[in-house]
């Protein structure tokens, strides 16, 4: 079982809970999510299964899209509705549209103190829960779009298109700071993560093997190189072969269309970075025999 499942994460569970549920349902250990969603958030959560976990590092870090709701009037210590208020109720002071425009573009964003960001090797949220002072370093992010969808004071619905690593909770908090009234996130739904759309997402309790996106399709922007039988053996062993391709990375296939490896391309050489099948399985299929020693990538 290899590929990616696009899960519509329900509210109230962690991204790790989703991973554990898939491990239990399908009886497979190699499972990992591609981009964390907070427990309060719902929506698109890509989950790599089997061999897909090995090539996740090569999946393009593409923009993400969200829809959500912000409550103006006071801030919370978690920057969302799960937290404790940190300020008294105050009215909006300033122009909302101008404040949103100021939070669009390239930003040095400070993550929430209740986040998985590491401080001295420990997740920030663990320190924050002990009431220890948490000084978060700013992270460079890009907010391509921050648009109002509706406004019924004190609530505003919005849409955001942003780079991976952007904290929408921080965006809500910073907007409240600019308006002098405080604000926090009350709901969030991820509608797109890279090429994965909410229309593709499947409820966790309904997901099946038929929902798997094949491993090779995840890397379709990469060039495809088809190799001879002789070069196939070299690739399965992790050895380099010659090529005329000049892209940084390529997908390697054999003559039968089997996805063999992801490789770096350097100075006319294809150097396998992740080999997806062992030489043993190839020889077993070809000769009907089992080698005593399996050669893995």
Residues of each region from the PLM?
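Helix-hairpin-helix/helix-loop-helix acidic hairpins
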Residues: 140-154
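Glycine/acidic-rich beta-strand-loop module
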Residues: 30-60, 126-129
């Amino acid at each position: 079982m290899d590929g990616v499942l696009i899960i519509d994460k329900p509210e109230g569970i962690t991204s790790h809970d989703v991973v554990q549920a898939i491990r239990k349902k399908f009886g497979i250990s190699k499972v990992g999510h591609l981009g964390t969603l907070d427990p309060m958030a719902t929506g698109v959560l890509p989950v790599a299964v089997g061999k897909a976990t090995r090539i996740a590092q090569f999946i393009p870090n593409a923009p993400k899209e969200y829809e959500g709701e912000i409550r103006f009037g006071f801030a919370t210590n978690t920057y969302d509705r799960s937290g404790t208020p940190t300020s008294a109720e105050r009215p909006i002071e300033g122009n909302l549209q101008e404040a949103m425009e100021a939070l669009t573009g390239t930003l040095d964003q400070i993550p929430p103190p209740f986040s998985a960001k590491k401080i001295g090797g420990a997740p920030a949220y663990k320190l924050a829960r002990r009431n220890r002072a948490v000084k978060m370093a700013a992270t460079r992010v890009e907010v391509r779009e921050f648009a109002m969808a509706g406004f019924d004071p004190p609530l505003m619905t919005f849409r955001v298109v942003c780079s991976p690593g952007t904290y929408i909770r921080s965006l809500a908090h910073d907007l409240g700071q600019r308006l002098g009234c405080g604000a926090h996130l009350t709901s969030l739904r991820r509608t797109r993560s890279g090429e994965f759309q909410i229309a593709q997402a499947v409820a966790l309790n309904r997901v099946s093997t038929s929902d798997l996106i094949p491993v090779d399709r995840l890397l379709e922007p990469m060039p495809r190189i088809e190799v001879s039988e002789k070069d196939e053996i070299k690739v399965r062993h992790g050895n380099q072969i010659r090529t005329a391709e000049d892209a940084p990375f390529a997908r390697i296939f054999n003559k039968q269309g089997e996805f063999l490896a992801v490789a770096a391309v350097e100075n006319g050489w294809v150097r396998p970075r992740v080999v997806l099948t062992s030489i043993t399985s190839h020889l077993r299929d070809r000769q009907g025999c089992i080698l005593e020693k399996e050669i893995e990538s």
